Amino acid sequence: MGQKTNPIGNRLGIIRGWESNWYGGNDYGDKLAEDDKIRKYIHARLSKASVSRVIIERTLKLVTVTITTARPGIIIGKGGQEVDKLKEELKKITDKEVQINIFEIKRPELDAHLVGASVARQIENRISYRRAIKMAIAAAMRMNAEGIKIEISGRLNGAEMARSESYKDGRIPLSTFRADIDYALVEAHTTYGRLGVKVWIMKGEVYGKRELSPLVGLAKNQGKKSGAGRGGNKSRRRK
């Protein structure tokens, strides 16, 4: 089962918290669609700010948006001008007061979305996908990841027939629920079409009780300094 499901969704309520935190009645669908609209808008508006996750919390009159990013200075701007502009733009979407919190990702090499976005950006700039993937894997293992796997699918190097290739270092125990695995899917837009880049990063195992807030686990992993990643197996699989 662990091989077929999204690793994040599979661990919700166990070691991972939800990224939308609010209660809804008959307006549940509208709020969910609004959350999706907010996330898409932020990722498009801040495409150069290395935004990873957008966590949304709601009360009756306030929407709190927490943005996790590796480049907070771009979002905040000089004297906070840019974040004030963003707040006004989000008010038009929600018709409510908006509060924006910025959380800095200090180790982007261990964030699956940022790793995938980096690989996708290099592919769009015509850098060899093998080189981009191997560099990303090496960087993650240097930052003490216990394992990382990257899979790329599509018309690789402009081939007429689409295929998939995966590269792995360390261990990714997808069926172990206490395994803290980050996952992301990012698309690269090339002249030959879209390429899908999937990233799994194993950060360690969680024992005992854990507060199910997305930021708790993120803060813990950013400050984590452990020994070298377990498992030395390096493998590549082609389909």
UniProtKB/Swiss-Prot annotation:
GO MF annotation terms: mRNA binding; rRNA binding; structural constituent of ribosome
GO cellular component, one term: cytosolic small ribosomal subunit
Domain KH type-2: residue ranges: 38-106
InterPro entries in the cross-refs: KH_dom, KH_dom-like_a/b, KH_dom_type_2, KH_sf_prok-type, Ribosomal_S3_C_sf, Ribosomal_uS3_bac-typ, Ribosomal_uS3_C, Ribosomal_uS3_CS
GO biological process: translation
Domain of life assignment: Bacteria
Keywords recorded for this protein, A-Z: Ribonucleoprotein, Ribosomal protein, RNA-binding, rRNA-binding
S-S pairs: none
UniProt-listed SMART domains: KH
Region feature (Disordered): 218-239
Family, per entry: Belongs to the universal ribosomal protein uS3 family.
Described function: Binds the lower part of the 30S subunit head. Binds mRNA in the 70S ribosome, positioning it for translation.
Cross-referenced NCBIfam families: rpsC_bact
Annotated PANTHER family: 30S/40S RIBOSOMAL PROTEIN S3 (PTHR11760), SMALL RIBOSOMAL SUBUNIT PROTEIN US3C (PTHR11760:SF19)
Subunit structure: Part of the 30S ribosomal subunit. Forms a tight complex with proteins S10 and S14.
Protein name: Small ribosomal subunit protein uS3
